[in-house]
Amino acid sequence: MEKPKYNRIVLKLSGEALAGEQGNGINPTVIQSIAKQVKEIAELDVEVAVVVGGGNLWRGKTGSDLGMDRATADYMGMLATVMNSLALQDSLETLGIQSRVQTSIEMRQVAEPYIRRKAIRHLEKKRVVIFAAGTGNPYFSTDTTAALRAAEIEADVILMAKNNVDGVYNADPRKDESAVKYEKLSYLDVLKDGLEVMDSTASSLCMDNDIPLIVFSIMEEGNIKRAVIGESIGTIVRGK
């Protein structure tokens, strides 16, 4: 059995990652693949927390740009993350992996409310904990949720899984063939150069709490495990 480099991780999944190539909605094949990858690392006794975005179903910024009240649009986005989280929980439990969804907005009929100490206890019992509904506050992204929850549960690393890129580049590799991929970066580099890794609030939170971040592609099966056991994949962001 491979020895994991990290004992407790936060896996950040964008909503788009769950949509796969169809671009929106929830792709059952993709979510099953992600669940299998999570099972691989859970079987290494890694404590796994997951933060899921909602962009495959709804984006608060899109609603705001169309004239909606920003807070209302963001709350709709939080509800989208709950739908994604329940879908992921179902896929995990189909594979025999115990999991719990905790929401920042109370909806006790479908999930537990977020309680930090309870989340940590679930992790210690090797249950996968899925954090849904963002931070529970409008104007904050699910990237910031991942940074906040990682700090709260004292995670060793954030694994940021992307579905359309395999790391951080100095330009969009889909538009610029000369784009160069970074192997390592500091959070100050990310903030100073305006690199599209995560928003500035999330980057600052990770930097202040010294939480390393690995950005990699979710589309290649086995990549989550490769990141956890310390193989060099994607881009690692750490320190000042």
From Swiss-Prot:
Cellular localisation: Cytoplasm
One GO molecular function term of this record is:
ATP binding
Q: Would the keyword Nucleus turn up in this protein's UniProt record?
A: no
Q: Does the keyword Transferase apply?
A: yes
Q: Where does ATP bind?
A: K12, L13, S14, G15, G55, R59, N163, Y169, D172
Sequence positions that bind UMP: G54, D74, T135, G136, N137, P138, Y139, F140, S141, T142
EC main class here is transferase
State the activity regulation: Allosterically activated by GTP. Inhibited by UTP.
What InterPro entries does the database record attribute to this sequence? AceGlu_kinase-like_sf, Asp/Glu/Uridylate_kinase, Uridylate_kinase, Uridylate_kinase_bac
Catalytic activity as recorded in UniProt: UMP + ATP = UDP + ADP
Q: Name one GO cellular component term.
A: cytoplasm
- State which Enzyme Commission number(s) the record gives: 2.7.4.22
Which Gene3D superfamilies does the record cross-reference, listed alphabetically? Acetylglutamate kinase-like
The pathway is:
Pyrimidine metabolism; CTP biosynthesis via de novo pathway; UDP from UMP (UMPK route): step 1/1
Residue ranges of the region described as Involved in allosteric activation by GTP: 20-25
Q: Which residues cross the membrane?
A: none
Biological processes per GO annotation: 'de novo' CTP biosynthetic process; UDP biosynthetic process
Keywords, ordered alphabetically: Allosteric enzyme, ATP-binding, Cytoplasm, Kinase, Nucleotide-binding, Pyrimidine biosynthesis, Transferase
- Subunit structure of this chain's protein: Homohexamer.
The family classification in the record reads:
Belongs to the UMP kinase family.
NCBIfam families found in the cross-reference section: pyrH_bact
Question: PANTHER family per the record?
Answer: URIDYLATE KINASE, URIDYLATE KINASE PUMPKIN, CHLOROPLASTIC
Instruction: Write out the function statement from the record.
Output: Catalyzes the reversible phosphorylation of UMP to UDP.
Q: What is this protein called?
A: Uridylate kinase
Q: What is the lineage of its organism?
A: Bacteria, Bacillati, Bacillota, Bacilli, Bacillales
Annotated gene: pyrH
